[in-house]
């Protein structure tokens, strides 16, 4: 696929429908919907670090002010 065709498929949804499919195939055809429902929310999120301010709020910034 040429660069122009790739860019056209990004911008134009009709062109995207007519372009070649994903080389890996359709990932949703391998799993049944019931199997995918079991995957959603399958794990608990556990924070590695919890930082709270004296007022009860938590703040972390890009400058690493809340290093654990």
UniProtKB/Swiss-Prot annotation:
List every position bearing 2,3-didehydroalanine (Ser).
64
Keyword 4Fe-4S (UniProt): no
Q: Which family does it belong to?
A: Belongs to the type B lantibiotic family.
Q: Respond yes or no to whether keyword Hydrolase is given for this record.
A: no
- Give the source's domain of life in one word: Bacteria
Task: Report the GO molecular function annotations.
Answer: signaling receptor binding
**Which stretches are tagged as propeptide in the UniProt entry?**
1-48
Where does the record put the Beta-methyllanthionine (Cys-Thr) cross-link? 49-50
**Which InterPro entries does UniProt cross-reference here?**
Lantibiotic2_lead_pep_dom
Record-listed cross-link S-(2-aminovinyl)-3-methyl-D-cysteine (Thr-Cys), residues: 63-68
Q: How is it modified after translation?
A: Maturation of lantibiotics involves the enzymatic conversion of Thr, and Ser into dehydrated AA and the formation of thioether bonds with cysteine. The carboxy-terminal beta-methyllanthionine undergoes decarboxylation. This is followed by membrane translocation and cleavage of the modified precursor.
Crosslinked positions for Beta-methyllanthionine (Thr-Cys)? 52-60, 61-66
Tell me the keywords, alphabetical order: Antibiotic, Antimicrobial, Bacteriocin, D-amino acid, Lantibiotic, Thioether bond
Q: Which GO terms describe its biological process?
A: defense response to bacterium; killing of cells of another organism
Region of interest (Disordered), residue spans = 1-28
Report what the protein is called: Lantibiotic mersacidin
Summarize the protein's role: Kills a number of Gram-positive bacteria. Acts at the level of cell wall biosynthesis by interfering with bacterial peptidoglycan biosynthesis. Specifically inhibits the conversion of the lipid II intermediate into polymeric nascent glycan strands by transglycosylation. May interact with the peptidoglycan precursor rather than with the enzyme.
Lineage of origin: Bacteria, Bacillati, Bacillota, Bacilli, Bacillales
């Amino acid at each position: 696929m040429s660069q122009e065709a790739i860019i056209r498929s990004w911008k134009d949804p009709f062109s995207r429908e007519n372009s070649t499919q994903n080389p890996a195939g359709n990932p949703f055809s391998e799993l049944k919907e019931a199997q995918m429902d079991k995957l959603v929310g399958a794990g608990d999120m556990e924070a590695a670090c919890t930082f709270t301010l004296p007022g009860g709020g938590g703040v972390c910034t890009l400058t690493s002010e809340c290093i654990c």
